Amino acid sequence: MSNAITMGIFWHLIGAASAACFYAPFKKVKKWSWETMWSVGGIVSWIILPWAISALLLPNFWAYYSSFSLSTLLPVFLFGAMWGIGNINYGLTMRYLGMSMGIGIAIGITLIVGTLMTPIINGNFDVLISTEGGRMTLLGVLVALIGVGIVTRAGQLKERKMGIKAEEFNLKKGLVLAVMCGIFSAGMSFAMNAAKPMYEAAAALGVDPLYVALPSYVVIMGGGAIINLGFCFIRLAKVKDLSLKVDFSLEKPLIIHNVLLSALGGLMWYLQFFFYAWGHARIPAQYDYISWMLHMSFYVLCGGIVGLVLKEWNNAGRRPVTVLSLGCVVIIVAANIVGIGMAN
């Protein structure tokens, strides 16, 4: 396995670790509605950081974006909005299926759809079937899916042992939402694929290869921001128990505390795709669709590890932890299989 591929896998791991940890600061926010907290974090992660970093990278910010036709920018934006819809459905999936089953089904579907639909859209799916390296990477995707399934099973065993149940368990409604969440969340993968002309334009301006994907986030995350922030603002305006004014009428130190923690959560959310861009830049072009598989499977891996570190599994018993460990090992094996396949 080449050093470039190894580093690509490593940066995807770092990005996924940030994704697995990003919600920790949000849990420390006090006396704010979820909608206010999520909006503040989202403004940082989907608007401020993409714009600020792009302004630093590009020699002429406005000239860069105005150089693209609507036919180039619109798919990128709409796929970003598609991801935003999936993101909203994510919480509802947890509500009706419970954390473990909801995450397992949603992540499993978005892993498959986001990984395999990209080469199909690009018309090079035959690379997966007709070449040794392609077949090896396809095997890695399958093994990763098995790993996600094992980790999901571990979560179910943990919830059963600890008496944790879904807020309003409804299998039919939950499955529909999980499938929708999985498909729509893959919009981020499609958006990045559609943004390739933006990568090329950034490279032509002298932007370092590690950073060429970052300017596209202004458009991608802009689409997602409209959906997420729109959802939050509508709820803040219509739901009687929610009030932005009340949330910002608390004691000043508490407001500052909440803003800083929400901003930190937003920063950590953004960093997952900052390092995704670094990892993606190291992956061979013919296997660039594998970036999504690496990110999603490592997200599940890191989520399990973070749960162990935070002692969330302490009262779960030995069997769930053993199953979780097995799932993590399978995901690591999958990453190595994919790496070997790309090297071939």
Curated annotation (Swiss-Prot):
Keywords: Cell inner membrane, Cell membrane, Membrane, Sugar transport, Symport, Transmembrane, Transmembrane helix, Transport. It is a multi-pass membrane protein. The keyword Aminoacyl-tRNA synthetase does not apply. It catalyses: L-rhamnopyranose(in) + H(+)(in) = L-rhamnopyranose(out) + H(+)(out). Uptake of L-rhamnose across the cytoplasmic membrane with the concomitant transport of protons into the cell (symport system). Belongs to the L-rhamnose transporter (TC 2.A.7.6) family. This is L-rhamnose-proton symporter.
